[in-house]
């Protein structure tokens, strides 16, 4: 059976490559980018992932963190052993808890075209949604119910702007 053509070729050392740079590049690629800034700052590359998370007071394995109680055949109560995990970096845990407790603000906004459309409809027809459905600016032929939903969405997403608009109408 014939041999592959270039399989027996002698390997040559490439003097053009910077080995130090290649090693740094490999290490950087092998260590993933940690998105959370608190964990990233407290991370120690010399320690394992499990050890790093244990030092911060975080769980590496959720099955070990909250183990399921096994049902035993005998009724003798076995006391669970207390956890010996010592949190070396509690500030990370405190910062994560503080960040999680902050209320998340609603970032949903409507397009300027939709805001302009709703304002035109209210300016022309007030609360008459049937008349809005017959309006010539109703390009997408929205039903009265769809227009009512768009107005309600505008009220919910931009309450101050909606109130200011109603005051400007008089």
From Swiss-Prot:
Organism: Tetraodon nigroviridis (Spotted green pufferfish)
UniProt similarity note: Belongs to the NOP16 family.
Descriptive protein name: Nucleolar protein 16
UniProt entry tagged with the keyword Nucleus: yes
Keywords: Nucleus
Membrane-crossing segments per the record: none
Compartments reported by the entry: Nucleus, Nucleolus
GO biological process: ribosomal large subunit biogenesis
PANTHER family, per the entry: HSPC111 PROTEIN-RELATED, NUCLEOLAR PROTEIN 16
Cellular component annotations (GO), alphabetically ordered: nucleolus
């Amino acid at each position: 059976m014939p041999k592959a053509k270039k399989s027996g070729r002698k390997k040559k050392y490439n003097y053009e490559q910077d080995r130090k740079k290649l090693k740094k590049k490999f290490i950087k690629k092998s260590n993933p980018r940690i998105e959370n800034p608190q964990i990233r700052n407290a991370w120690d590359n010399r320690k394992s992932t499990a050890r790093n998370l244990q030092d911060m007071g975080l769980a590496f394995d959720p099955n070990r963190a909250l183990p399921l109680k096994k049902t035993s055949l005998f009724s003798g109560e076995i006391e669970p052993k207390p956890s010996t995990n010592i949190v070396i970096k509690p500030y990370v845990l405190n910062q994560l808890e503080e960040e999680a407790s902050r209320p998340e603000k609603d970032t949903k906004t409507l397009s300027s075209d939709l805001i302009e459309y709703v304002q035109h409809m209210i300016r022309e027809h007030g609360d008459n949604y049937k008349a809005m459905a017959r309006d010539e600016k109703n390009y997408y032929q929205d039903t009265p119910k769809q227009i009512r939903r768009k107005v309600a969405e505008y009220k919910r997403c931009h309450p101050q702007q909606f109130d200011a608009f109603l005051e400007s109408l008089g």
